[in-house]
Amino acid sequence: MACAEYSFHVPSLEELVGVLQKGLTDNFAEVQVSVVDCPDLTKEPFTFPIKGICGKTRIAEVGGVPYLLPLVNEKKVYDLNKIAKDIQLPGAFVLGAGAGPFQTLGFNSEFMLLVQTESEHRPPVNGSYFARVNPADGGCLLEKYSEKYHDFGCALLANLFASEGQPGKVIEVKVKRRTGKLNFVTCMRQTLEKHYGDKPVGMGGAFIIQKGKVKTHIMPAEFSSCPLNSDEDVNKWLHFYEMKAPLVCLPVFVSRDPGFDLRLEHTHCFSHHGEGGHYHYDTTPDIVEYLGYFLPAEFLYRIDQPKETHSFGRD
C-alpha cells in the first residue's frame, strides 16, 4: 500500500502559544493558551488507554472521502496495527476520526479512534467508540468498540494523530463564548495557515466541550446505492443532530495541504452519556466552553491516497 512521508514545519510550543492566543481572540470572548504538563488522559472524562500524547508525533491520513463518495469502495479496509508500522512507530498510540470498520460491524458508522497499537512488549488495546443511527428511532447509538469486537480495523478514510503516548509538555487551550463565525478547530487551523503560510503545520490532540451544545452528524448504516455527487447530496444523506456537553473530541488538522489531497480538518466526538459523532460547530455560542490539549506533528504520512479525487463531502 502506497505511503508517502512529509516533514511538517514544527514551531516551538511557546511560539504556537502566542500565535494561537492571538488568532483565537478574534473568535472567542475569553482565550487562555499556555504550555502545561499533559493531564493524565486515562482519567475521566477522557478515559484513553494511555496517559499522554507526547513522543514522536505524527499525522496519518489513510484513504479518503473518494473511497466513500460518490459510491463506496468496499475493498478499502485497514488495520491500525499495520498502519502504526507504516508510519514507523509500532506500538503507537493513535487517536482520530474515521469511518467505522463495516467489514466487522456489518454496517457503516462514525468511528472515534483510540488505539494503543501492538508492540513487542505489550498487546494492543482498543479504546475506540463508534456511533451509528439507531434503526428504531433515528437517534444516536454510541458504543465502546471493544465491548463486542476484538479487531483493530477501520475503513475507507481516517485522519489520525499518533505518538508514543507519553506524558510531557503540551499546549493547553481554554476558550469561552464564541464571538466569531468559525468553529474551534477551524479557527485554530486558519490561524496557523495565516501565520505560517506555505510552511504546513499539523496538529492533533483532544478537547472537551465543557458547556453548550454542538451540531454533529452520523452517516447512515447503509452506504448510498445512488451516487452522491455534491455537498447537497451528501447533506441529504447524512443524519444531523444537536448533542450536549460534555463531549470529548479527537481533532486532527493541518494548516495547509502540501500536495497530498488532505482533508485539512476532521474531528469526531464521544461522551459518557450516549452521544457522539462528527463535530461541525457549537450551536450555543453565548455559553460554549472548550478545553483542549494539543501538539504539533513532526511528520505526515499519506497512506493509500485516492488516485481519482474530488472536493465535496469534507465539511
From Swiss-Prot:
Q: Which keywords does this chain's UniProt record carry?
A: Hydrolase, Metal-binding, Nucleus, Zinc
Name its GO BP terms in alphabetical order.
Answer: DNA damage response; regulation of DNA repair
Residue positions annotated to bind Zn(2+) are H266, H268, H278
Record-linked Pfam families: DUF1907 (PF08925)
| Subcellular location, principal | nucleus
Quaternary structure note: Monomer.
UniProt-recorded name of the protein:
Ester hydrolase C11orf54 homolog
Q: What is the lineage of its organism?
A: Eukaryota, Metazoa, Chordata, Craniata, Vertebrata
